[in-house]
C-alpha cells in the first residue's frame, strides 16, 4: 500500500516536471523554435484547436519560423492566433505559408520573460509539494489505521521527502538553464 502511494506520488511529480519543461519551452528566447507555438490555439471551424495540430513548423533562420498550415483555409485564423499570442510578433503570410520574424529581445523584455519563467517554475514546485502533502496524508492515515507500522511509515515519508527534493531540484535546474538562455545576447 505504501509502495503504491509512493509510486503514484513520484509519477505525479514527474508530470509536474514535464509540464514545467513544456512551459519553459513556450517562453520566447532570442531564437525561434517550434515549441514556442505549443500553447497557442486558433479557431478552426468553430473549435479552439492548438495550432501545432493545424500546421507544421520549421526554423530556416535563427530568428524566423515558417508555419505551413495543413489546410489553407485555416491560414488567416492561425496567423491571427499567432498575432494575438504573447510572443510579441507580427506574422505575415503569402497565401500558402506564414512567416514569423522574431525581433531581438530588449533587456526589459528578457527580464519580463525571466519573471514569467520564475512564476512557471514556482507553479511546478507548488504542484510537486502539493503531491507530497497528499501522499504524506495518505501515509499518515495508513499509520493511524494500523495498516503499516510506525517505522515503515517514517521510512516511506523520508523516501517521499527525498523524491520531492529530487524533483524540486530538477525544476530549479530547468529554471537556471532557461534564465541563462534568456540572458544570452
Swiss-Prot record:
Protein name: Ribosome-recycling factor
One GO process term, biological-process aspect: translational termination
Purpose: Responsible for the release of ribosomes from messenger RNA at the termination of protein biosynthesis. May increase the efficiency of translation by recycling ribosomes from one round of translation to another.
SUPFAM superfamilies with a match to the protein in the record: Ribosome recycling factor, RRF
GO cellular component entries: cytoplasm
Location of the protein in the cell: Cytoplasm
MF GO annotations: ribosomal large subunit binding
Upper taxonomic lineage: Bacteria, Bacillati, Actinomycetota, Actinomycetes, Kitasatosporales
Membrane-spanning segments: none
Protein keywords: Cytoplasm, Protein biosynthesis
InterPro entries (UniProt xref): Ribosome_recyc_fac, Ribosome_recyc_fac_dom, RRF_sf
Stated family: Belongs to the RRF family.
Amino acid at each position: 500500500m505504501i509502495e503504491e502511494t509512493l509510486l503514484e506520488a513520484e509519477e505525479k511529480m514527474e508530470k509536474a516536471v514535464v509540464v514545467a519543461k513544456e512551459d519553459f519551452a513556450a517562453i520566447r528566447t532570442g531564437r525561434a523554435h517550434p515549441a514556442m507555438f505549443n500553447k497557442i490555439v486558433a479557431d478552426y471551424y468553430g473549435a479552439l484547436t492548438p495550432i501545432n495540430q493545424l500546421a507544421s513548423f520549421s526554423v530556416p533562420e535563427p530568428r524566423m519560423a515558417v508555419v505551413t498550415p495543413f489546410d489553407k483555409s485555416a491560414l488567416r485564423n492561425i496567423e491571427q492566433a499567432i498575432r494575438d499570442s504573447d510572443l510579441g510578433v507580427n506574422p505575415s503570410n503569402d497565401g500558402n505559408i506564414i512567416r514569423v520574424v522574431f525581433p531581438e529581445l530588449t533587456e526589459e523584455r528578457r527580464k519580463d520573460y525571466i519573471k514569467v519563467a520564475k512564476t512557471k517554475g514556482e507553479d511546478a514546485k507548488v504542484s510537486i509539494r502539493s503531491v507530497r502533502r497528499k501522499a504524506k496524508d495518505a501515509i499518515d492515515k495508513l499509520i493511524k489505521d494500523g495498516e503499516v507500522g510506525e517505522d515503515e511509515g517514517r521510512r516511506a515519508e523520508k523516501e517521499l521527502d527525498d523524491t520531492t527534493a529530487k524533483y524540486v531540484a530538477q525544476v530549479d535546474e530547468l529554471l537556471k538553464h532557461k534564465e541563462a538562455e534568456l540572458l544570452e545576447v
